[in-house]
Curated annotation (Swiss-Prot):
Designated name of the protein: Acetylornithine deacetylase
Pfam families: M20_dimer (PF07687), Peptidase_M20 (PF01546)
Classification of source organism: Bacteria, Pseudomonadati, Pseudomonadota, Gammaproteobacteria, Enterobacterales
CDD domains to which the protein is assigned, alphabetical: M20_ArgE (cd03894)
Enzyme class per UniProt: hydrolase
Quaternary context: Homodimer.
Pathway in which the depicted protein is active: Amino-acid biosynthesis; L-arginine biosynthesis; L-ornithine from N(2)-acetyl-L-ornithine (linear): step 1/1
Active-site residues annotated for this sequence: D82, E144
SUPFAM superfamilies: Bacterial exopeptidase dimerisation domain, Zn-dependent exopeptidases
E.C. code: 3.5.1.16
Source organism (scientific name): Shigella flexneri serotype 5b (strain 8401)
Catalysed conversion reaction: N(2)-acetyl-L-ornithine + H2O = L-ornithine + acetate
Length: 383
């Protein structure tokens, strides 16, 4: 029953008080089970059917799907339950205690993005779900901040095909219809160690990496010349060399060298296409030095994403907000949800607050976010 729900601010407070950090380091990584239980209980109180889905390959992480109504189509509202780790020395407030000051709600996950679920629950107080003509789905995912395992697994296993979806990431209520992807690789070269007094007796991995980097930089230039998407502020795929390490002493021939790099592909470029371009670029080195160069993923790749600009979802949201859709450079779960249905990224709070000490959401977003959620439910589930 709706009267069982706590007030909006208490829902928000409970979400922030329930830690659900995602991290690649096992010591920092936390299960989101308690947060999923909170959400599941609240949606059950509203009469929703709730399914909790364990996510394989994670450390006790779960997705939750709350649904009301049956039949084809409908609306999916989605978000992730996890947060990034926090630097205790840089926060001036308790990250797990919601505090309000000067028109801002402070706490880890206030903007990115536990707060979105508080907005959904509060908006549903004013929606008579018994009158829905199409189903309404609420998806809460795991591990967006690391592997995006929750969204990947849900998209791979669900039979749902809603009419459209909105992911409530912090966009300052500016609708986003496209973003670049992210591929991060480790280039590793295995040389042969030896004393520096006789270089011919070894294979210097740093020298081989120098050769490889030349080919990678040529790929970077080719990407800039061949691919264009003018809506982006950086209108081509970027390639960055971010980290390199090799050798251990000035008088030893370097046996190992490792380079970390990333590519941010634009929408429409497939992951297979990018892997092929990288392998082709490195082929001269691999052919000259067989078995010494390997390419490994640092994390599962994220493709670029785009919602068709002429889709009904774009038209409806632009009309409701009086704002045109945008494209952004950061990544979300949208590429995976987009495999199910046309998807927009749209939510309260600023992306500039994401992953920052003293993260906050401005209270000016409360009323318009609540109204927007009610409006999109009415449009896509009542008509």
């Amino acid at each position: 029953m709706k009267n069982k729900l706590p007030p909006f601010i208490e829902i928000y407070r409970a979400l922030i008080a329930t830690p659900s950090i995602s991290a690649t380091e096992e010591a920092l990584d936390q299960s989101n089970a308690d947060l999923i239980t909170l959400l599941a209980d609240w949606f059950k109180d509203l009469g929703f059917n709730v399914e909790v889905q364990p996510v394989p390959g994670t450390r006790n992480k779960f997705n939750m799907l709350a649904s009301y109504g049956q039949g084809a189509g409908g609306l999916l509202l989605a978000g992730h339950t996890d947060t990034v780790p926090f630097d205790d020395g840089r926060w001036t407030r308790d990250p797990f205690t919601l505090t309000e000051h000067d028109g801002k709600l402070y706490g880890l996950g206030t903007a990115d993005m536990k707060g979105f679920f508080a907005f959904i629950l509060d908006a549903l107080r004013d929606v008579d779900v018994t009158k829905l003509k199409k189903p309404l789905y609420i998806l809460a995912t795991a591990d967006e901040e690391t592997s995006m395992a929750g969204a990947r697994y849900f998209a791979e296993t669900t039979a749902l095909r809603p009419d459209c979806a909105i992911i409530g990431e912090p966009t300052s209520l500016q609708p986003v219809r496209a973003h670049k992807g992210h591929i991060s690789n480790a280039i590793r070269i295995q040389g042969q160690s030896g004393h520096s007094s006789d270089p011919a007796r070894g294979v210097n991995a740093i020298e081989l990496m120098h050769d490889a980097i030349g080919h990678i930089l040529q790929l970077r230039d080719n990407l800039k010349e061949r691919y264009h998407y003018e809506a982006f502020t950086v209108p081509y795929p970027t390639l960055n060399l971010g980290h390199i390490h090799g050798g251990d002493a000035s008088n030893r021939i370097c046996a190992c060298c490792e380079l970390h790099m990333d590519i941010r592909p634009q929408p429409g470029m497939t992951l297979n296409e990018l892997n092929g371009l990288l392998n082709d670029a490195l082929a001269p080195v691999s052919e000259r030095w067989p078995g010494r160069l390997t390419v490994d993923e640092l994390h599962p790749p994220i493709p670029g994403y785009e919602c068709p600009p002429n889709h009904q979802l774009v038209e409806v949201v632009e009309k409701l907000l009086g704002a045109k859709t945008e494209v952004v450079n950061y990544c979300t779960e949208a590429p995976f949800i987009q495999t199910l249905c046309p998807t927009l990224v749209l939510g309260p709070g600023s992306i500039n607050q994401a992953h920052q000490p003293d993260e906050y959401l401005e209270t000016r977003f409360i009323k318009p976010t609540r109204e927007l959620i009610i409006q999109v439910i009415h449009h896509f589930c009542w008509h």
